[in-house]
UniProtKB/Swiss-Prot annotation:
Gene3D superfamilies: EF-hand. This is Parvalbumin beta 1. PANTHER family: PARVALBUMIN, PARVALBUMIN ALPHA. Residues 39-74, 78-109 form the EF-hand domain.
C-alpha cells in the first residue's frame, strides 16, 4: 500500500470497491474518491514516484496495469482496455508513457 499513506484508508477502500469488477475502473472516479484532486503538488509527485516503480521518470503500460496495487497489494490488475484508456487520457504528448507533468494534470481532472 505504497500510496496509502497519502490518502484515508476508508477512501481507498471505497475507491477499490467501486472498481472491483473488471472493466469498471475510471481514473476520474478513483482520483476523486481518494481525494487526489485536492492533494498538494508535492503529494502528487510522491504518488507518481511510487507508481513509477522502475524510477524511469515515466509511468509505462506495465506500471499502469498494476496501478491499483499501489493502494492495496491484493487489488486486481487493470484490464488491457482499462490500461489503454488510462494511458490515452494521461499521455498528452503521445510518447506512450505518462510523465510527472501529465500525471499532475490527470489527477486534477
Amino acid at each position: 500500500m505504497a500510496c496509502a499513506h497519502l490518502c484515508k484508508e476508508a477512501d481507498i477502500k471505497t475507491a477499490l470497491e467501486a472498481c472491483k469488477a473488471a472493466d469498471t475502473f475510471s481514473f476520474k472516479t478513483f482520483f476523486h474518491t481518494i481525494g487526489f484532486a485536492s492533494k498538494s503538488a508535492d503529494d502528487v509527485k510522491k504518488a507518481f514516484k511510487v507508481i513509477d516503480q522502475d524510477a524511469s521518470g515515466f509511468i509505462e503500460v506495465e506500471e499502469l496495469k498494476l496501478f491499483l496495487q499501489n493502494f492495496c497489494p491484493k487489488a486486481r490488475e487493470l484490464t488491457d482496455a482499462e490500461t489503454k484508456a488510462f494511458l490515452k487520457a494521461g499521455d498528452a504528448d503521445g510518447d506512450g508513457m505518462i510523465g510527472i507533468d501529465e500525471f499532475a494534470v490527470l489527477v486534477k481532472q
